[in-house]
C-alpha cells in the first residue's frame, strides 16, 4: 500500500513537471525612468494565453514645486498570435491607482493643467493593448506594449503643487485615450 502511494506521488509529480508552464518576471523601463519602483510577473496557462500582473510605486517627490507620488496595479490577460512569450500579443487589462501629482509639464502636451495645479485622488479603468516580445536569448526578452482604454478619475484639485495648498474643487473625470505604455526587460523561467 505504501509503495503504491509513493509511486502514485512520483507519477503525479512527473506529470506536473512535464506540463509545467513558463513564468516571467519583468521591469518597465519607462516607469523606472520616472523614478518609480516597479515589477511584473507573467504566467502562461495555455499554449497562447498568459496572465500578467504588474505594479508600480513612486512614494517620494522630487522638489517642493513638483509632486509625483503614486501607486498602480494592472492585471492583464494576453493572447499571443504565434506562441507565448514570442512575437505579437493582444491584451485586455484593468488598472487601479492612487495619485498625488502636480507641478509637472507632461510630454506631447498631455494634461497641461498639471503644470500649475496639484491633483490627488484615485482612478480605475481598463482597455485593450497590443505588444511585441523580442527574444534576445533563451531567457531574456524585450517587451514593447501600448494600450488604449477608459479611466474613471476621482480627484481633488489644489491651487498649486505645494502640499498645504488651497483646495479649489472636487470632481471626477472620464478619460478615453492612451492609458498604457511599457518598454520592459523580461526574464523567462523555463
Q: What do the PLM-derived regions correspond to, one by one?
A:
Residues 23, 48-53, 85, 139-142:
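Repeated loop/turn-to-beta-strand initiation elements of outer-membrane beta-barrel proteins
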Residues 25-27, 41, 53-55, 75, ...:
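Membrane-embedded beta-strand positions of outer-membrane beta-barrel proteins
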Residues 29-33, 55-61, 79, 94-100, ...:
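Transmembrane beta-strands of outer-membrane beta-barrel pores
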Residues 34, 46-48, 82-86, 135-137, ...:
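Outer-membrane beta-barrel channels and translocator barrels
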Residues 57-67, 98-122, 154-174:
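Flexible, solvent-exposed loop segments that connect beta-strands
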Residues 175-190:
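Outer-membrane beta-barrel "beta-signal"
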